[in-house]
Amino acid sequence: MADYINEIKKRRTFAIISHPDAGKTTLTEKFLLYGGAIRLAGSVKARKASTHAVSDWMEIEKQRGISVTSSVMQFNYSGHCINILDTPGHQDFSEDTYRTLMAADSAVMVVDAAKGVEDQTRKLFHVCSLREMPIFTFINKMDREAQDPFQLLEDIEAELGIKTYPMNWPIGSGKDFKGVYDRQNQRIIAFNGGNHGSTEVEAIEGSVEDEKFREILGEALHDKLMEDIELLDIAGDDLDMEKVRVGELTPVFFGSALTNFGVEPFLEHFLEMTTSPLARNSNIGEIDPFDDKFSAFVFKIQANMNKAHRDRIAFMRICSGKFTKGEEVFHMQGGKKLKLAQPQQFMAENREIVEEAYAGDIIGVFDPGIFSIGDTLCAPSKKFRFEGIPTFAPEHFARVRPVDTMKRKQFVKGVTQIAQEGAIQVFKENHVGMEEIIVGVVGVLQFEVLEYRLKNEYNVDIKMDRLAFRYVRWIESYDGDIDKLNLTSDAKRVKDFKDRDLIIFQNDWGINWALDHNKGLVLSGVGKSDE
């Protein structure tokens, strides 16, 4: 018993969020470098000697240098077992990011030191704040020309409405970025570069009072640091861990993921300050992670992670207890007992079978097509459902059909699997078969990914016609006959994959018309996955 409790206490499960190009994937890779999970870090942009970022495993990601799927990686560091959820950096994949954040206990927000808070940072931060998650900020790219650090803190507070507490302070920036000052321990960490970030960086550490740093840093930088320290001590907020835990205050770290400057100090402080797995809400109350009964929920489904395997993996966040390979669990939505075949843990596309896993861990299990996002798995002796994960209303629509009608079977299989992953939403028109469907997406890049994946994974070329619809609403209730709804000529009634009735509209006026002309009609912009 004590063993499994100690294992859970070691777990730290967090997601990394950022605007595209702020350096999120590079930072993820450097965590793995320091954790000993990889020996040599390859630059994401340079792609030297064909080294690709460990977490960017889908071919389209390698070509574009962006993350469009969420990757899951586990490694050990300093007595902790760390689960990193690397989220899509592209704004068109915000729904996938939201689901990933549901599986995390805290978030690391990466901010570009030259640009400050950017559009996608705001959106992702908003999702984190809705969950009242602890958020830790890493201000990246200090090795390039950067904004004034005080200005960056002000920017975060003004743009995001969260207080900041700098845990360390940069010494210089751009080519003069020499290191960081650790405020907690009142120590200077001066970096000795030269390996271009491919291996762990060497550092000279010592007390801020040590005169040798005047020589190492140069008088101008040393004097500026002393002035900044004084200003911070007078003007800044106190570090209130209770406010950190509820997402009202963010500890801020400065560094450069590319050169590794500041990565290890950040990782060490972060692990000290974050918590082990947190309790989760369910229909029977909070589920304690230290409960001895296993429970988990599905937050992601990924088909064809390996083209050679043609497989489909359901990713689960374990929320309580211990999971043992071959253990019988109860699938609430399916209403039956299961044995989870070959539970796996991942380092991007590399996988290994696990014998056991604990609350906080992410495991992948083979999915023969029975799981959906938000499903609960629990011990047969203690049945309950975790809170569902909402479905975002798509904003872009297209009519999609296979170019070759003889490939209808592959087309249906492909769109079904990609829809079950949550990457697209598929709508069926009344009296029209599956040979032609309407696809809804949150962002237009998802159309490109759909086309790419159908061709590369299912050998199906598609014809895609964009539609003028902008809104989808689920029909929650209606007093009359749904087939006789009074709608404008440019609105269309459809069904989703769960056979729920929806209406797609071109504008707000169409929505208001439907509500005004159909007594008792209740519409919702969100579909719950546990329905």
Protein language model regions, located:
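Structural and coupling elements of P-loop NTPases
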Residues: 1-531
